[in-house]
Amino acid sequence: MTFTIKDFNVSSVNINVLCKQCQHYYSQMNSYHHGNLKKELLDCALKMCERDGYTKLSIRSLAKESNVSQTAPYRHFKTKEDLYAEVAIEGFNKIHKAISKYDSNDSKRNLIDGAKAYIKFGLKNANTYDLMFGTAIKDFTKYPMLFEAANKTYLHIRSTFKEFSKNKDDLYIEESCIDIWA
């Protein structure tokens, strides 16, 4: 059987072959990013941040490094600062996880082990740490999840220090924790 479309003859056999090729191409397109693209991009951004420093991290360089189209990351990060905020959130979550492991009845041990974990994170992830505590993100309150992650980490440090400290004065605790945080 043959169809004619504006002087273009196509046999039914050719249509079947063409359809199979299209299905194969379509399935490849759909499976190109079979996972969570945002997570893959964020993991890549963290690696790039550590390798090159956050000042070299851009949405364009992230797309290139991740082997995705230049527009793909923009679906998840509208601006460079949005990307920085997401990297910083991951950093604060990692610090919080590291320092939260220590929850014994010995407040001195908790403080020492938590401080070691905090310092270890900073040394191992120096560029991410610089991003988290630097000036690249102008206003943490613009990013509620970033503010929450940073605050959760700070409050854990504060609570651990308060348990350890013999001086329970709130102003003393706050000033001491700001020194620890910095």
Q: What are these model-derived regions, one by one?
A:
Residues 86, 100-127, 152, 176-180:
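Hydrophobic alpha-helical connector segments
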Residues 37, 41-44, 91, 176:
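N-terminal positioning helix adjacent to the helix-turn-helix/winged-helix DNA-binding module
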Residues 40, 48-82, 86:
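Helix-turn-helix
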